[in-house]
């Protein structure tokens, strides 16, 4: 509990280093009375404990805060179901963190983030080495019944089938040159901003191809063309577009995180 309180205090006050934190715990009356354990904190003990348990403690704090926030914040766009945007971001690491392998002289960890678009807050996180692949983490970030919302880096036809079988829905932008075999063109609403809506098979038979038909919605925004693959046939084309546009919230969050870091 002492380590947990100190770590929360550290991040709330945005200390520049552990040494600055320890100095504050020794000199600040509030910190000495309510944060530091009785008898103070030994530097060597503190750093050893943090190196061994920091991630575990912070993950616990994150999970508890996420539960409380989700229960109090209003839910938006509930008609779309539970939407979870996924993305990855690098975190600088010291060379002694050998598990965070990235480059010979540059260790980085990778934060895989699931962002709850319904409540506008982070939902789930996974930490891997910097070279860790992003697509395999989706099954840890998104639960069955929820919908993954992702960019082109997560396009994987075999995983689309796997997620569908597991009950994990997906709304994923795909590359413009993706081969599509149209099985059925779906009707568009009058004056719809979408220019394409169809049930298709993605990929070619000689390569990686979806076994289960998916839906692809095409639209343009600010002069850029988007193709969105999904298994959500229950939504309108406009709702698929809205769900993908909401994904940009995670990019805003990640950019702010990188600026703070």
Model-derived regions, located:
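Single, function-defining residue in the core of a domain
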Residues: 1-18, 24, 51-53, 60-61, ...
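DNA-recognition alpha helix
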Residues: 17-35
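Short hydrophobic/aromatic segments of transmembrane alpha-helices and their interfaces
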Residues: 29, 74, 237-238
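Catalytic micro-motifs at enzyme active sites that drive phosphoryl/nucleotidyl and oxygen chemistry
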Residues: 34-35, 71-74, 99-101, 159
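Major-groove recognition helix of helix-turn-helix-like DNA-binding domains
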Residues: 34-53
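Short Lys/Arg-enriched helix C-cap and helix-to-coil transition segments
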Residues: 57-69
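A short, well-structured juxtamembrane/interface segment
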Residues: 66-75, 133-135
């Amino acid at each position: 509990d002492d380590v947990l309180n100190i770590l929360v205090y550290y991040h709330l006050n945005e200390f520049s280093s552990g040494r600055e934190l320890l100095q504050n715990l020794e000199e600040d009356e509030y910190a000495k009375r309510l944060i530091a354990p009785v008898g103070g904190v030994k530097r060597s003990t503190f750093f050893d404990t943090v190196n061994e348990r920091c991630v575990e403690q912070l993950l616990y704090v994150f999970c508890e805060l996420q539960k409380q926030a989700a229960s109090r914040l209003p839910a938006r766009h509930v008609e779309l179901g539970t939407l979870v945007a996924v993305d990855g971001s690098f975190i600088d690491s010291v060379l002694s963190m050998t598990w965070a392998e990235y480059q010979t002289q540059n260790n980085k960890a990778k934060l895989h983030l699931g962002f709850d678009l319904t409540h506008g807050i982070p939902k789930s996180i996974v930490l891997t080495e910097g070279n860790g692949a992003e697509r395999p983490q989706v099954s840890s970030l998104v639960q069955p019944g929820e919908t993954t919302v992702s960019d082109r880096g997560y396009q994987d036809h075999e995983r689309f089938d796997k997620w569908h079988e597991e009950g994990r829905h997906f709304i994923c932008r795909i590359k413009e040159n993706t081969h599509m075999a149209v099985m059925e063109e779906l009707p568009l609403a009058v004056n719809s901003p979408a220019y394409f809506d169809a049930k298709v098979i993605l990929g070619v038979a000689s390569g990686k191809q979806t076994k289960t038909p998916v839906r692809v919605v095409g639209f343009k925004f600010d002069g850029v063309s988007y193709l969105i693959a999904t298994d959500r046939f229950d939504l309108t084309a406009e709702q698929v577009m809205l769900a993908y546009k909401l994904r940009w919230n995670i990019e805003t969050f990640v950019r702010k995180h990188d600026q703070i870091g």
